Swiss-Prot record:
It comes from Arabidopsis thaliana (Mouse-ear cress). One of its GO terms (cellular component) is Golgi apparatus. This is Putative fucosyltransferase-like protein. Residues 25-34 have a biased composition (Low complexity). Residues 1-39 are cytoplasmic. It is a single-pass type II membrane protein. May be involved in cell wall biosynthesis. May act as a fucosyltransferase.
Length: 513
């Protein structure tokens, strides 16, 4: 009959010893055995419940939350113990179906021990040198010494080793640096000045350039200085220099092209004395912004740019530079230079960022270099190793979300700061999966960890700010920095919700400013 056959109490016409009754039903007031029988009958469901719970605990088939659910369902369905189940509000009071218990369960069920421990088996890159002091993932560079590298510089690598190209030169001079061409040639990892490359290697950094150094008096009679030595550049910079000179703008030229001043000077110190600096690149290529531009910022000399079409993305403020996009722009730019040179108040506005601080967008860009490109390469490779393991059919199946009864769903996502390797757990409620809720949850998580932004030790003192974290961008892990900083955004909360639902245990990166 099964273990639950007697939950309904004694059958009519039988004593508790199961002998047929004679002379009708015995009187309850005159039969002690009937009283004992009723008490035992009431206790029987409790005994059965304890047996069931013991079995469940022994087999380890249910987690703590499921065990509570089973117990609740059993008691609420047994009329001898509870005739009416507790209301949902009461369940919350006694700890049932809570978000907290879901989070604890997800932390346990979603935890993973990866097969490769990078502290014991670091990322290994053949060639190059370890030119950083610290990295959030263990990584070594050098000769192979019998070990198969994770990656190596150059083509022709053995199976299992990814090939890397790294260069800070323009793709117009070195076509192999073009992202599409590098892929066609067989490079797995591209490291160039392009923010669309796998691991960008830009000219900018807080460590190399004292960008926030104070502005010095402009003492030179000429209002602009030029340092141009390659007179055969693949753009119109030489023509632009000549055209500016023809507009009666006095320019001191220290380079090999139209030199009229001795070039044996400290470039940055010389630029500090001029109101304008001709930051003319040798090619007009997206993201190709060299020291010419950043040295101008250090000097507090307004850069006049010939170069990348997206130079505004590299500027500390929208009015901090002048841009000659084509030869047609020379005349209006010259007119603007003359106006600013003659109006101190207007000119000072172009350097306002030196006193008030650059834009968050500029800080987010330069902060990327707070982690050395070689370390970012190691993080890129280690992330790839883990992603490949996660895609394996033998990888642990994780729930990544939790709902108890009719309560709201709790989603488990993972977030790390750009420039770091390990992920942190963040939980979102299904009814409030919004961008605002995601930012709030991420801030709360990292604040609870007393997290220090990766750029904290690199920025100049007046830009380090207080201990409060501010989010500039949150984006799905795996985007390029061009996508992350400029192109990507969720198209509303429904887009974010769909991403989380379609990507169990979704991973994100956050950029703090």
């Amino acid at each position: 009959m099964g273990v639950f056959s007697n939950l309904r109490g004694p059958r009519a016409g039988a004593t508790h010893d199961e002998f047929p009754a004679t002379n009708g039903s015995p009187s309850s007031s005159s039969s002690p055995s009937s009283s004992i029988k009723r008490k035992l009958s009431n206790l029987l469901p409790l005994c059965v419940a304890l047996v069931v719970i013991a079995e469940i605990g022994f087999l380890g088939r249910l987690d703590k939350v499921a065990l509570v659910d089973t117990l609740t369902d059993f008691f609420t369905q047994s009329p001898s113990l509870s005739q009416s189940p507790p209301a949902r509000s009461d369940r919350k009071k006694i700890g049932l179906f809570t978000d907290r218990s879901c989070e604890e369960w997800l932390m346990r069920e979603d935890s993973v021990t990866y097969s490769r421990d990078f502290t014991k088996d670091p990322i290994f890159i053949s060639g190059g040198e370890k030119d950083f002091q610290w990295c959030s993932v263990d990584c070594t560079f050098g000769d192979s010494s019998g070990k198969t590298p994770d990656a190596a510089f150059g083509l022709g690598q053995k199976p299992g080793t990814l090939s890397i190209i790294r260069s800070m030169e323009s793709a117009q001079y070195y076509p192999e640096n073009d992202l599409a061409q590098a892929r066609r040639r067989g490079y797995d990892i591209v490291m160039t000045t392009s923010l669309s490359s796998d691991v960008p290697v830009g000219y900018f950094s807080w460590a190399e350039y004292d960008i926030m150094s104070p502005v010095q008096p402009k003492t030179e009679r000429a209002i602009a200085a030029a340092f141009i030595s390659n007179c055969g550049a693949r753009n119109f910079r030489l023509q632009a220099l000549e055209a500016l000179m023809k507009t009666n703008i006095k320019i001191d030229s220290y380079g090999g092209c139209h030199r009229n001043r001795d070039g044996k000077v400290d470039k940055v110190e010389a630029l500090k004395r001029y109101k304008f600096s001709l930051a003319f690149e040798n090619t007009n290529e997206e993201d190709y912004v060299t020291e010419k531009f950043f040295q101008s910022l250090v000097a507090g000399s307004v850069p006049v740019v010939v170069g990348p079409p997206n130079i505004e993305e590299f500027a500390p403020a929208s009015d901090s530079f002048l841009h000659i996009k084509t030869m047609e722009d020379v005349e209006p730019v010259a007119k603007r230079m003359k106006y600013l040179a003659a109006n101190p108040a207007a000119y000072n506005q172009t350097l306002r960022w030196k006193y008030e601080g650059p834009s968050d967008s500029f800080k987010a860009l330069v902060d990327m270099a707070a982690v050395h490109s070689s370390c970012r390469l190691c993080i890129f490779l280690a992330t790839r190793v883990r992603e490949q393991e996660e895609e394996s059919p033998n990888f642990k199946k994780r729930p990544c979300k939790c709902s108890r009864g009719g309560s709201d769903t709790v989603y488990h996502v993972f977030v790390r700061e750009r420039g770091r390797f390990e992920m942190e757990s963040v939980f979102l409620r299904g009814k409030s999966v919004t961008q605002e809720a995601l930012e709030s949850a991420v801030l709360a998580k990292f604040k609870s960890l007393k997290h220090e932004a990766v750029w904290k030790k690199e920025r100049p003192g007046n830009l380090k700010g207080d201990k409060e974290l501010k989010i500039h961008r949150i984006y799905p892990l795996g985007l390029t920095q061009r996508q992350a900083l400029y192109n990507f955004k969720f198209e509303g909360n429904s887009s974010l919700s769909s991403h989380i639902q379609n990507n169990p245990c979704a991973k994100f990166e956050v950029v703090f400013v």
